[in-house]
Design a protein with these regions (language model features):
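Boundary at the C-terminal end of the N-terminal hydrophobic targeting segment
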Residues: 20-23
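Residues embedded in well-ordered secondary-structure elements
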Residues: 12, 30-32, 176
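A metal-dependent hydrolase metal-coordination microenvironment
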Residues: 26-150, 156, 182, 189-218
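Divalent-metal (Mg2+/Mn2+/Ca2+)-assisted nucleotide/phosphate chemistry catalytic cores
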Residues: 153, 162
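Positively charged n-region of N-terminal signal peptides that target proteins for export
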Residues: 1-5
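Extracellular glycoside hydrolase catalytic/binding regions
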Residues: 158-160
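Bacterial N-terminal signal peptides
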Residues: 7-18
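Distinct, well-ordered alpha-helical segments
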Residues: 120-123, 163-179, 199-201
Length: 219
């Protein structure tokens, strides 16, 4: 009986503590560039609707608590290991979390990660309108569809050793074709704990945006 009472007391204490610290926003003070407004953004995150561990509303709330102004949910199109348990389309995470984001005054960017072998690797399509249209086996057709939706295309973790064993980021002919068409807009320099210094030269030489994201899957 004493053990049970102690367990209940500890559980209640932990619950009380978690409630006391949740819902708090940790502001990041980053000055504006003259003539612009600086926003803190994460353009690469995952939820349970691909290979992430959090429900979409939790991911959005987490971003707000971390002090971000905008977040993109970019679940994989081709890799959905929880699909046997979650019967939904590729817009589900956006649909579920939009109301929560609006309530937090957080900009929620509609996105998806087009997930292919290297090359071309993994690319985020940001600011899309319908992820369900990005299911063509032809990679270039998927990118074209995203671009027609107004997408910003980002080349993700180009030096990720699971796809690039030597860890050296490269622009392959298919990437150069995207650049020539104006269909590639940025490359990740930072991805979670990794950074790829050569990306700075790639972006400078091809007039692409230098990106940094969490690629968060857990918490």
């Amino acid at each position: 009986m004493k053990t049970r009472v102690l367990f209940l007391f500890v559980s209640a204490l932990l619950t009380s503590f978690s409630l006391s610290v949740s819902g708090q926003r940790h502001e990041m003070s980053i000055p504006d560039i003259p003539g612009y407004v600086t926003l803190k953004c994460d353009f690469h995150t995952h939820t349970i609707f691909s290979d992430g561990l959090l429900w979409p509303t939790q991911r959005v709330t987490e971003a707000w608590e971390d002090g971000l102004d905008a977040v993109a949910i970019t679940d994989h199109i081709e890799y959905t290991p929880h699909k046997d348990y979650l019967k939904a389309d590729y817009n589900a995470a956006w649909d579920i979390s939009k109301k929560t984001a609006d309530g937090l005054n957080l900009i929620l960017i509609h996105g998806a990660e087009i997930t292919r072998k290297m090359p071309p690797g993994h690319l985020n399509a940001l600011f899309i309108t319908d992820a369900n249209q990005l299911t063509d086996p032809d990679f270039m057709k998927d990118i074209e569809t995203a671009v027609k939706q107004g997408a910003f295309i980002e080349y993700n973790h180009p030096g990720w050793k699971n796809q690039q064993p030597d860890g050296i980021p490269r622009l392959y002919p298919i990437h150069m074709e995207l650049i020539a068409k104006g269909w590639l807009n940025g490359i990740e320099y930072f991805n979670e704990y990794e950074n790829y210094p050569l990306v700075l030269d790639m972006c400078r030489d091809n007039k692409l945006a230098v990106m940094g994201n969490s690629d968060v899957h857990g918490v």
